[in-house]
Amino acid sequence: MPSISIGETHAPLGARSRDAKAVSRRVIKAACYMAIGLLAGGLLPNAGARADGGTSVGDLTLRAAIDRALSADPSLKAGAIEVEAAAGRTLQAGLRPNPQASIEVEDSIGTGGYRGFRRTQTTLQISQLFELGGKLDRRVEAAIAASNVVRADRELLRLDVMARTTEAFVKLLGAQRRLSIAEARAKRTATLIPALRRRVEAGASPTIEVTRGQVAADMAKIEAGRARAALDTARRSLAAQWGLAPPDFAHVAGDLDTVGPPPALETIIAGLDDNPRLARWNSVRSAREADVRVQRSLAAPDLTIGIGPRHYAESNDAGVVFSLSMPIPVSNRNQGNIIEAHRELAKTGEERGAARLDLYRELSAAYGELAESWAEISQLRGTVLPAARDALGGVQAGYGQGRFGVIDVLDAQGTLNEAELRYGEALVAYHAAVAKIEGLTARPLSPPGPSARSE
């Protein structure tokens, strides 16, 4: 972590702005890495391909969703205004005190010989306060450092908006997948009813099987309706990221199926210090170091110099008056503010350490979710789903031959449906965890290898 001496020797003003540039570079890099990771994961398609393989004019990509959210978020607009306000404070900090004009009339409107204005002495004086101890430079440094913190905070807001939008986007992709699964189940169950009626009419099955099949078909329709309602909610949630109601898009375009094994946790933790939330503390440290120098400079007394003509009414003569004034720092040498500034600086490292610990906790939790979802995906994709599909195919074939009943068919359909739903939920959890980890570390996870893509 770069540090600046607390003493009088200090870096030039240009060096103070490097912290903001460093933080901005980290934030831009984090945003780029997030996009790269999502491209590798299939969430940022180059064309509007729906999750179910079709296309639609109303499809929305993640990139477009993030652009909308960034352009419409009120907190970002307020942050931009705050950056402008900080620029005004920096400008004000570099302004010198204005000169003062004063007029002084003596020996007038008195008694005796001083009655009226016959013996009046009139002095017109211009005085200027000269700030000593490098106050102006220290003040400008502090204002620039404070502006860097404001910029860093605004960039963090950008990352938060991107993270929220990505999370809503992934959830909407999952909702689209859930609806597709529910509609497929409803279609499979509905096609079973005519076959059941024919078997009952032929005397091959009891009448109760038609009732059971109809109940299953109705339940599948209800589930499809629930999935459709959940999809509408997820769509509105995404549109709410840029304040749009109702949504003006039909679907979001992305591919949840492109996944791969996560790297080791130690590899991920190695990038934790690149997180912009930690980089912000470099700007905070610089701002507090600058405040220490400001408070030290305020201990130096300022000098006020005045000069001006004096007119003597009695003799009609004129003279010049010079004045010098300076406070004597006997008791107040700004000791309290200097101590406060030093203590504020001293706690910066601990605050950064606490922030890093919080990030580590978040990263560990996100990695746990990633590892858990990957394990579930691997098992579902490798054994459970193929077995469930084979079982359904075998039961359906056996049902046509009279070897299985309708309950067997419905059970096999339900098992496959449950496995497909669990698989979709695991994919959503996987991509949500990836997005969170990439936001925390400001770097992409290793993209899935060829074996992962081909599974």
Can you say where each PLM-predicted feature lies in the sequence?
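Acidic, low-complexity, intrinsically disordered peripheral segments
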Residues: 2-4, 10, 15, 21-23, ...
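Periplasmic alpha-helical coiled-coil/stalk elements that build and connect Gram-negative outer-membrane
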Residues: 3-5, 154-274, 366-369, 373, ...
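Bacterial N-terminal signal peptides
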Residues: 31-42
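Small/polar, glycine/serine/threonine/aspartate-rich low-complexity segments that form flexible
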Residues: 52-58, 102-135, 139, 249-263, ...
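Amphipathic alpha-helical coiled-coil scaffold segments and their short linker/junction regions
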Residues: 64-70, 205, 209-210, 214, ...
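A glycine-/polar-enriched beta->alpha junction
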Residues: 67-77, 84-98, 113-116, 124-141, ...
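Amphipathic alpha-helical coiled-coil segments
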Residues: 78-90, 157, 161-182, 191-194, ...
